[in-house]
């Protein structure tokens, strides 16, 4: 798998960085490449935008992200995805000011995929 294979739009579902493992949000993740062939990520979750940049190696995608909270502060974190196929990403994430005892989780499925889920 190459970094170019990951470019596209994904439907996401995830859980927040707390003790609950239940799906707490859904949204869309769009991955593109910049002029240096690095990943640019744009999330839309519950009408909120998040952005990030990242890199890819050995089927692992790492994205440093940030967003403005409702309190107008900028929050930052890192997301790590295992690229199961070019259409399925399974990941976890952590924010700087999140609960350090837990990780958030995120599952991504390419929106135009023909792959079936189990």
Q: What would you call each of these model-derived segments?
A:
Residues 1-118:
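Central antiparallel beta-sheet cores of small beta-barrel/beta-sandwich binding domains
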């Amino acid at each position: 798998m190459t970094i170019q294979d990951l470019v596209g739009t994904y439907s996401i579902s995830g859980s927040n960085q707390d003790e609950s493992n239940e799906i707490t949000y859904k949204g869309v993740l769009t991955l593109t490449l910049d002029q240096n062939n690095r990943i640019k990520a744009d999330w839309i979750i519950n009408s909120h935008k998040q952005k990030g940049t990242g890199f890819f190696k050995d089927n692992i995608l790492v994205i440093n992200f940030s967003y403005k909270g409702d309190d107008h502060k900028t929050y930052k974190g890192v997301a790590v995805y295992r690229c199961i196929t070019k259409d399925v990403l399974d990941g976890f994430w952590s924010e700087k000011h999140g609960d350090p005892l837990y990780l958030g989780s995120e599952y991504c499925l390419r929106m135009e995929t023909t792959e079936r889920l189990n």
